[in-house]
Amino acid sequence: MANITTKETPKITPDLLKNPYQKIINASASVFDEKHGRSFFSPQFYEKIEPYLKEVLTHPIDLECDLNTAKKKNRLTPLKQLFKACFNTEEILIVNNNTSAVFLIANALAQEKEIVVSYGELVGGDFNLKDILLSSGARLHLVGNTSRTYLRDYRLALNENSKMLFKTHNPAFKKDTPFKDLQALAKEHDLIDYYNLGDVDLLDRTALEEVLALKPSLLSFSADKSFNSVQAGIIMGQKEWVETLKNHPLYRALRVDKITLTLLFHSLNAWVNHQEEITIHALLHQTKDALLQKALKLYALLKPLELNVSIASSFSKIGNLFGRELESFCVKIQSKNTRALNGEKLYLRLFQKGVITRISCEFVCFEVFSLNEKDFEKIALVLEEILNKA
């Protein structure tokens, strides 16, 4: 008789019970990167909302019950009212991220129908929009090329199976078809017009307001970067289409919970009334002189160490937002004993201590865009420890 081996159950060790994520110092060139948890709250914002957040997390709440009528209510009602007041939109829906928004819209409104979309708007970044749309059950009719698409390309693509004209925000496009022209074409042929803003250009928030002013059938974007909030996908648009999405069975799998709704409400509140509390607002409004002063302060702390230290001009970027560079400065370091501690070893040892940098031509570079003075002190201490052990 063959021996039957059973798989041993893994033991629950103390290491498995440690907090799974730790704070890092982001001295890389990518701000609000997905690998780093994307956006984050400022300390003053968190301190302000912490008492209410504690109440929501430690008690039952009226998430879906109306205390005035004793009837069931929509969990989105408080946020819908605020969003409508802020953006003058007909209707709103919130799902767990913008990818969910794209998938839900395509699945609920264009399954087995054609979505006409520019080829160039499916190119670039890690987010594979084409796969998401195809997985929804919709068919894609690609028009144009990687850098140019004209209105006539959309018009020639239309047929009896066409259901939606789809546009994705792409600032790198050389020849872009204005969304208002797509809207006119959609209206002419009784089609849905949908604008996927994705990660809205945070240095130009008018992009969102301009599209909303056109009263699109549908619009979606990411909440975390736009409002410095939790991960969520915001769908706005005409009531007819948003109601169809809300009543679709898939929506229940994609809807957000009480924590997301609470944090999103307070983020939008701060976005309207107290922008100084928003981390994104503070970082993106740094002057070039302020960034240089940050670089000089870090330089002064690192210069006494056994390092070659210099300052250079550089660029940072917002996550995977294509085509947007932020002027900045970096502090470049190199060990004076490169045999014992070359650039790659130094980069790795910093990484292991939670200090995320970039490496360029044997130099380790600290991008100062996301750093603060407490970070400078920690970086100096970590480097001193690494050099003493080298």
From Swiss-Prot:
The keyword Protein biosynthesis applies. It catalyses: L-seryl-tRNA(Sec) + selenophosphate + H(+) = L-selenocysteinyl-tRNA(Sec) + phosphate. Pathway: Aminoacyl-tRNA biosynthesis; selenocysteinyl-tRNA(Sec) biosynthesis; selenocysteinyl-tRNA(Sec) from L-seryl-tRNA(Sec) (bacterial route): step 1/1. Keywords: Cytoplasm, Protein biosynthesis, Pyridoxal phosphate, Selenium, Transferase. The modification N6-(pyridoxal phosphate)lysine is found at residue 225. It is found in: Cytoplasm. Its EC number is 2.9.1.1. It is an enzyme of class 2 (transferase). One of its GO terms (biological process) is conversion of seryl-tRNAsec to selenocys-tRNAsec. The keyword Transferase applies. Pfam families: SelA (PF03841). Its cofactor is pyridoxal 5'-phosphate. InterPro entries: PyrdxlP-dep_Trfase, PyrdxlP-dep_Trfase_major, SelA-like, SelA_trans. Gene3D superfamilies: 3.90.1150.180, Type I PLP-dependent aspartate aminotransferase-like (Major domain) (3.40.640.10). GO terms for molecular function: L-seryl-tRNA(Sec) selenium transferase activity. It comes from the Bacteria. GO terms for cellular component: cytoplasm. Converts seryl-tRNA(Sec) to selenocysteinyl-tRNA(Sec) required for selenoprotein biosynthesis. Belongs to the SelA family. HAMAP family: SelA. This is L-seryl-tRNA(Sec) selenium transferase. It comes from Helicobacter pylori (strain P12). The gene is selA.
